[in-house]
Every structure is written in C-alpha cells, then in structure tokens.
C-alpha cells in the first residue's frame, strides 16, 4: 500500500480488533490464560491468582474481553461471575487456532 492509499475498512476493523484484544500486557496475559485452558470456568479471584495480576486489574480487563466476544460471562446468583473462553464466536475460534499454531514456537523464544 502506497502512502497515498487509504487502508480498506476491513483492514481498519481488523487492526482495531487486534489493538483491543492485545490492549495491554495484562489483557494479553488473561487472553493467553483462557487459551491455555479453553474448557475451564474461572472466577475473578482464580484468574488473578493464576495470572499473578491484581484483582483490580483482572476486573478492569475482563469487560472488554467479554464485550469483544472472546470470553463468556456466566452469572451464578447475584454475586458470582464465572468466565470461560467463548468457543462459538468467529473471533475466538480464529484466535484459538492462531495460538495453537504458534504455541510450539513460543518455547523457542
């Protein structure tokens, strides 16, 4: 693409989506945590403990992931919230496939 060409709207959407998914190191760590355990349910405290991030950080990064359709939130009663990788959305399927493909190479880095 030359300097004068405008990026296509599809490119912009994809670029923005990747920026949203990997918005911070904390959010990236949480995404990876769910990708490593795609069939497990987690509450906020367990996510914080297993990712070694502050509970307040987990609370802040979870909502954007839910809004994007990467993580599914399930409310149990009035106070308990459980989270699991959303496996039915295209964005999460593509991300999971990508992660599975690169995972063996991450150990080399």
What are the roles of these predicted feature ranges?
Residues 46-49:
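A short acidic, leucine-rich amphipathic alpha-helix
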Residues 69:
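Glycine-centered, phosphate/nucleic-acid-interacting loop/turn motifs that mediate DNA/RNA or nucleotide
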Residues 2-29:
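Short alpha-helical segments that sit at the start of domains
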Residues 35-39:
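Short helix-capping/hinge SLiMs at alpha-helix to coil transitions
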Residues 75-82, 88:
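Short, Lys/Arg-rich nucleic-acid/phosphate-binding segment
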Residues 62-63:
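Short, hydrophobic-biased segments on the C-terminal half of alpha helices
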Residues 90-109:
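Amphipathic alpha-helical dimerization/coiled-coil segments
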């Amino acid at each position: 693409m030359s300097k004068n060409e405008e990026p296509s709207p599809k490119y912009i959407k994809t670029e923005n989506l990747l920026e949203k998914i990997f918005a911070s190191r904390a959010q990236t760590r949480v995404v990876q945590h769910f990708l490593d355990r795609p069939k497990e349910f987690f509450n906020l405290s367990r996510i914080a403990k297993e990712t070694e991030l502050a509970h307040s950080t987990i609370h802040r990064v979870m909502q954007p992931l839910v809004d994007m359709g990467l993580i599914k939130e399930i409310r149990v009663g009035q106070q308990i919230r459980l989270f699991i990788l959303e496996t039915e959305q295209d964005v999460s399927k593509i991300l999971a496939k990508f992660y599975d493909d690169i995972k063996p190479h991450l150990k080399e880095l």
